[in-house]
From Swiss-Prot:
Record domain MADS-box: where: 3-63
CDD domains for the chain: MADS_SRF_like
A matching Pfam family: SRF-TF
Transmembrane segments: none
GO MF, any single term: DNA-binding transcription factor activity
GO biological process terms held by the UniProt record: positive regulation of transcription by RNA polymerase II
Record keywords, A-Z: Coiled coil, DNA-binding, Nucleus, Transcription, Transcription regulation
InterPro entries the UniProt entry points to: SRF-like_MADS-box (IPR033897), TF_MADSbox (IPR002100), TF_MADSbox_sf (IPR036879)
Subcellular localization: Nucleus
Protein name as it appears in the record: Agamous-like MADS-box protein AGL97
Coiled-coil ranges per UniProt: 88-130
Gene Ontology CC terms: nucleus
Family matches, as SUPFAM superfamilies: SRF-like
Length: 266
């Protein structure tokens, strides 16, 4: 015997889990009934439902024929929704016997079908490129990592050990170089100090020379004054020499006279 089907009371379900289950089932049933009504009566329907939980990812659940936006916009404007069907869906075309009109409708449908297939190919190509690019990159990275680890397990370990020993030797050499650099720093310090000393000595020599120059200038001034005195003495000597010349000329002239007198006496 089949069990008796228990009816659910039409009131708010307090428990969250049964409420969510009931919402999901009855929403799908409502959409199914609305789609049947649209097909049977050519009605345009829009259904908007809020989710049960406030933490849901979806803000609204909607169903519409021909579209929710078209029906809601027509409702807000208080107008009949625009007919968005294709022109060949008109009932008058089904009863038409005009071959040219039917041929035009078939051409329009074939063109639309060809465009839809082209768009579908482009969509599939884009999805394949988006799917395969990350996968191929990931595979390449994994292969590269495995190759590196495989090689590192055998040869690169020995190289790492030898590199460590070489690094230890290099560290020792670096310590010696540091000591040499310390010695060079001391040498540079002594050289710079000696250069500063030589510069200071040269400055002292310059000051001494300047002082000596002042003394030499005073000596030169005194020598100039002495020379002036000597020049005065020389002038006096020249005057004396002039007097002597006169005396000598006088004596020579007197001797010449005496000689002439003696010759006359003879």
């Amino acid at each position: 015997m089949g069990g008796v089907k228990r009816k659910i009371a039409i009131e708010k379900i307090q428990n969250k889990n049964p409420r969510a289950v009931s919402f999901s089932k009855r929403r799908k049933g409502l959409y199914s009934k609305a789609s049947e009504l649209c097909l049977l009566s050519d009605a345009e329907i829009a259904i908007i439902a809020t989710p049960v939980s406030s933490n849901s990812n979806a803000a609204f659940y909607s169903f519409g024929h021909s579209s929710v936006d078209n029906v809601v916009a027509a409702f807000l404007a208080n107008q009949r929704p625009c007919d968005e069907r294709f022109w060949w869906e008109d009932e008058s075309l089904l009863k038409s016997e005009n071959l040219e009109e039917l041929r035009e409708a078939m051409d329009s449908m074939s063109t639309m079908l060809r465009d839809l297939k082209e768009l579908e190919k482009q969509r599939d190509h884009q999805t394949q490129t988006l799917i395969h690019q990350p996968c191929s990159a990931r595979v390449c990275i994994q292969d590269y990592v495995t190759v590196n680890f495989d090689g590192f397990n055998t040869e690169e370990q020995t190289l790492a050990v030898s590199d460590n020993s070489n690094n230890n030797g290099l560290l020792g050499n670096l310590d010696e170089c540091n000591e040499d650099f310390d010695d060079l720093d001391q040498i540079f310090d002594t050289v710079t100090n000696s250069e500063f000393l030589s510069v200071n000595l040269e400055m002292d020599d310059v000051t001494v020379n300047s002082e000596g120059n002042t003394e030499e200038q005073t000596l030169a001034v005194s020598d100039n004054s002495n020379n002036n005195g000597l020049l005065g003495n020389l002038d006096e000597c020249n005057e004396d020499f002039d007097d002597l010349d006169q005396i000598i000329e006088y004596l020579t002239s007197s001797e010449a006279l005496s000689m002439n007198l003696k010759m006359d006496d003879v």
